[in-house]
Amino acid sequence: MKKVVITILFFFQTTFLYASDQEKKLNLLFNELKSDISTKSSEIEEKIWTLWSTHPTNKNLTLMLDKGTKLVQNQNLNKAIMVFTEVIKIDPSWAEAWNKRATVYYMIGEYKKSQKDIDKVLELEERHFGALAGQGLVNIQLKNYEKAIKSYKKAKDIYPSMQSAEIMIKKIEDLIKEQTI
């Protein structure tokens, strides 16, 4: 019995250390991203995406997420949703699993489901500039243009050199001007 308790304690302590280590790395990268407005920002962005897409403690979940991503690339969207949903059931605290499923919901036109998953992503990782950009796209589809602009501006606050956010803000502002004429 004592060995079982020690094993369980070791598992939880190790799991916490891996998750904590990943969070520290993300904090450093986000500080760099915010202060660096150069070509290096794309390298920092890539490192952040790699950390987000790697489960901190369970390699099998990372493999499942990769499998779902490949299904998306092959346009097998319903199966991808099933894979991402399974990952979410196993670890509902992994923001990137929610983000992947939100992306697929957006791709199939399920904008409200996509928004619901994006809300969960941002609850778990408020700095998720990808989810904020996705939220902008969802709000454009729902014709909530002011909300879309807010989402992109939040993304720009986190990632100042995010060009796609800058482009989308301008396009939405132009769209709003056209509608008021």
Label each region the model flagged.
Residues 54, 73, 107, 141-142, ...:
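Register position in tetratricopeptide repeats
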Residues 58-125, 130:
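Alpha-helical adaptor scaffolds
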Residues 27-37, 140-175:
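TPR/TPR-like (Sel1-like) alpha-helical repeat modules
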Residues 33-34, 49-52, 88, 122, ...:
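A conserved position within tetratricopeptide repeats
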